[in-house]
Amino acid sequence: MKTRQNKDSMSMRSGRKKEAPGPREELRSRGRASPGGVSTSSSDGKAEKSRQTAKKARVEETSTPKANKQGRSEEISESESEETSAPKKTKTEELPRPQSPSDLDSLDGRSINDDGSSDPRDIDQDNRSTSPSIYSPGSVENDSDSSSGLSQGPARPYHPPPLFPPSPPPPDSIPRQPESGFEPHPSVPPTGYHAPMEPPTSRLFQGPPPGAPPPHPQLYPGSAGGGVLSGPPMGPKGGAAASSVGPPSGGKQHPPPTTPIPISSSGASGAPPAKPPNTPVGAGNLPSAPPPATFPHVTPNLPPPPALRPLNNASASPPGMGAQPIPGHLPSPHAMGQGMSGLPPGPEKGPTLAPSPHPLPPASSSAPGPPMRYPYSSCSSSSVAASSSSSAATSQYPASQTLPSYPHSFPPPTSMSVSNQPPKYTQPSLPSQAVWSQGPPPPPPPYGRLLPNNNTHPGPFPPTGGQSTAHPPAPAHHHHQQQQQPQPQPQPQQHHHGNSGPPPPGAYPHPLESSNSHHAHPYNMSPSLGSLRPYPPGPAHLPPSHGQVSYSQAGPNGPPVSSSSNSSGSSSQAAYSCSHPSSSQGPQGASYPFPPVPPITTSSATLSTVIATVASSPAGYKTASPPGPPQYSKRAPSPGSYKTATPPGYKPGSPPSFRTGTPPGYRGTSPPAGPGTFKPGSPTVGPGPLPPAGPSSLSSLPPPPAAPTTGPPLTATQIKQEPAEEYETPESPVPPARSPSPPPKVVDVPSHASQSARFNKHLDRGFNSCARSDLYFVPLEGSKLAKKRADLVEKVRREAEQRAREEKEREREREREKEREREKERELERSVKLAQEGRAPVECPSLGPVPHRPPFEPGSAVATVPPYLGPDTPALRTLSEYARPHVMSPGNRNHPFYVPLGAVDPGLLGYNVPALYSSDPAAREREREARERDLRDRLKPGFEVKPSELEPLHGVPGPGLDPFPRHGGLALQPGPPGLHPFPFHPSLGPLERERLALAAGPALRPDMSYAERLAAERQHAERVAALGNDPLARLQMLNVTPHHHQHSHIHSHLHLHQQDAIHAASASVHPLIDPLASGSHLTRIPYPAGTLPNPLLPHPLHENEVLRHQLFAAPYRDLPASLSAPMSAAHQLQAMHAQSAELQRLALEQQQWLHAHHPLHSVPLPAQEDYYSHLKKESDKPL
């Protein structure tokens, strides 16, 4: 049992927190109040929540609670696990399917809790989120549900939550914070805590209160001074909020270990922040605002808890906090870690969102989930632990079922489970928890399962956890054995975390859970929790770990509690002592890389721890009380005792303890019990500590809480009430039974006032009033909490405004963009008109880049050449004009492109040379002249200035001429630039132009007017056309096509042979086409112009003439033939693209044609066969 107890403690802490509605609430409260766990969680959650909020806002709400839960650490996990505890699930899942009023309440509470918790939990979850996924099978679900439900729940719970949650959060926060702060102080506070605990008890969360004022204050102060509520709540919630705010949290969060989680949260929360809003919302939206402050509190507090911080660190590390944040989901640090590992981020995040719920679940899933659950389970820990664990595990989903269980199934399981759970449950009492509790009961089997899981998990877990695996199992065992040795736990936790990472992804949530759980279980719950918790929640876990551990380790526990609070690890470690917090932290941190997790845990745990501590302490509960003189001690003892003595007694004693704890703690009535025991202890555990306390208490206490079951319920109630810090005590009577609570009555009476807030009891659930949602708190004016809330609200408002502004700006930008586009269109039209009239204004450029044309797809080098490709290059634009008949054609019928446009494929329109030429020559020439002039002017900068650049492009036969230059093969293959065939090309240097002109003949002379040149080209084309009849000429012309095409592919292949052949052909065969004079295609054929220094090519041989021949006409028309030079690069580019496919087709066609006319080739073109076959092959290949 001890182990279990520990586990329970942890469970409680982890799961507990989450589990019991109370816990959850408490968690939430605690989450809120507990800076650490919750805070962290919360914060985390918050951050996460924020994040999630955004995403999961709702879910997150749920999640928030989750976060809280997470804070609960994995309370939710556990919860999830436990979701088992129906409540959780209920909350989450159940939320959707609220189990029972309680559940609902729980939900509510939980919601709130979730709110707060969510954050933490979320965070955890986030951490877990990692796991989110991770766990959340049940957990996730649960978590999700939780988150989601929670969201809902929180949403609804919100109503109360607002006040309450915030309150609770503060309380939670505070406690947590206290925890956090506590931790540092814990020792001291313990005592005070104790006393305060009681109030805290009531506050449970109020661990701080336990810290009593000091802690509280500290908490609060630490938390946020008054922040306790504020701060801590904030922490948790705030944390969440902060986290949410998150980011603020982040920073803030960071500071606080608790916050760390938040930070994680922050990180995790990054999302959470969004979530936090939720959380805050749920948790107390304000809290959101406050959270920052809270966080600050938290920070103060948090920092204190090194564990947390370590968590933080670790957290910061990915593992816990870091992980958490990082994973954000790491939430469950390890869970997250694991989850994170696997899921980590995604889930984390997603989980965060979705995971958020999931995260929780993941947390849940992760060990956390289980832990949480387990924690619940663990809480039940021994029995419950098993049960719970199982439950958790089982429950994870079972939680759901458990939820059903929740009904009070849990009570039965409660026996032990319940015992544990009850507390949990009791805490959960809030329905959620109850559910959980119940859940756990059902889970008990799972527990077995869990246990098995434990083992199994360990295996899986380990496997999953990898580290965890080894560790967990070992740790599990370790924990188990070591149960009291939280350290192992931490380690396991760590491991878990580490491992968890892995496990989380998949099953490990369960396994994790399991592992955790089982860790926890084996551990004692503490471990479970620790493991679980630590690992899942990391913070929660950790804290649970330590908290539990703390608890678990009674001795150390006491301090650990502190420590626990402080650092689960600490606790865990033996650091139990406050010192441990550090130590723990260190160890835990160290050990636990997850200490980071612990941060989460811490948050949770811290909270938990604190609470646990408180709880423990108080709960120490009572039992511990004696043992744990220091609260922690007490707690520790309690836990320790607890574990040790108490556990047994615990479980059994639990009731008493529970009672003690519960009543006292729970009730807050008895200071120890009240705070320590339950409220603090149980409640603490349950509520604030819930996770811690819950775990601790629950775990520890919980077992005692078996009794606390009832107590826990109280605790739960208290926990819920806890938010009402002091209120708690008054709030919940000490109902022995945790079974379905009576339907809540709406009372709306002030229940308790803390330094920073006034708690109003919204619903009276009779003895079972533990749902955080039952209470809502209104921050007192002037309190830090109020300030934080205001700040948060302000911040949110500012952010919203900022977003709105940005949106408007974007809208305006879009409008401007559209306007610009319209302007461009107008300019384009104008340009076209002007261009047609010969004075293409500069706007012409816009023509170039006409949207339709992919202007020049990089079909070829040419196409890719910057000058051409740059849509903005003037040359391009000009070319585009040419290339885009549709652009130019519109107004002018005479436009060369005009006629062809309608008939031909747009891509080729420009190339319908025959059509072009058929139009009125005079008009065409005039236009061309004008255009050419314009183009030249415009091109000068683009092309003439960079002739060298272009030449390569156009070195080719004339790119203008060559349809293929587009191919690039040719283009690339340009002959000596000097030979650039395209006399017209602006890029040609004057000399080249000169040379070309001379070579090509008058038609090409640069000095010729464009019109003249066109005429010359036309003549040339005609000449060629005559040749067109000559198959050889045609062939050669065609050759160019295939060749070019091939060119692009294999430059050298036939090229050389063909070149020779063609050269011969062009030279000898077709004297007609004197290579130089006529830019016959022959010459041009396949070789880059460079090859044939025929300026022929350059001269626009008008293929259009050639095209006129049937053979070539179709293909050519299709292919933008090498059209006239005037067509220019744009055309070429265009053609090029269009051509590629065409070319291949053409080549094949020609090939056949060639075969038919082979004899015609006077020139031996042996390569031709080759070439064609090659070509054919090529054409089969994609271009």
From Swiss-Prot:
Predominant neuronal expression, Expressed in most brain regions including striatum, hippocampus, cerebral cortex, diencephalon, brain stem and cerebellum. Highest levels in cerebellum. Also highly expressed in kidney and testis, low expression in skeletal muscle and heart. The keyword Transcription applies. It comes from the Eukaryota. One of its GO terms (molecular function) is JUN kinase binding. The modification Phosphothreonine is found at residues 646, 662. Keywords: Acetylation, Cell junction, Cytoplasm, Isopeptide bond, Methylation, Nucleus, Phosphoprotein, Transcription, Transcription regulation, Ubl conjugation. Residues 261-272, 377-400, 562-584 have a biased composition (Low complexity). A motif (Nuclear export signal) lies at residues 1026-1034. Residues 872-887 are annotated as: Required for interaction with FAT1. GO terms for biological process: cell killing; cell migration; determination of adult lifespan; maintenance of cell polarity; male gonad development; multicellular organism growth; negative regulation of transcription by RNA polymerase II; neuron apoptotic process. Pfam families: Atrophin-1 (PF03154). Residues 17-29, 45-63, 107-127, 788-832, 922-940 have a biased composition (Basic and acidic residues). Its main location: nucleus. The modification Phosphoserine is found at residues 34, 77, 79, 100, 102, 106, 625, 654, 732, 739, 741, 889. Transcriptional corepressor. Recruits NR2E1 to repress transcription. Promotes vascular smooth cell (VSMC) migration and orientation. Corepressor of MTG8 transcriptional repression. Has some intrinsic repression activity. PANTHER family: ATROPHIN-1, ATROPHIN-RELATED. This is Atrophin-1. It comes from Rattus norvegicus (Rat).
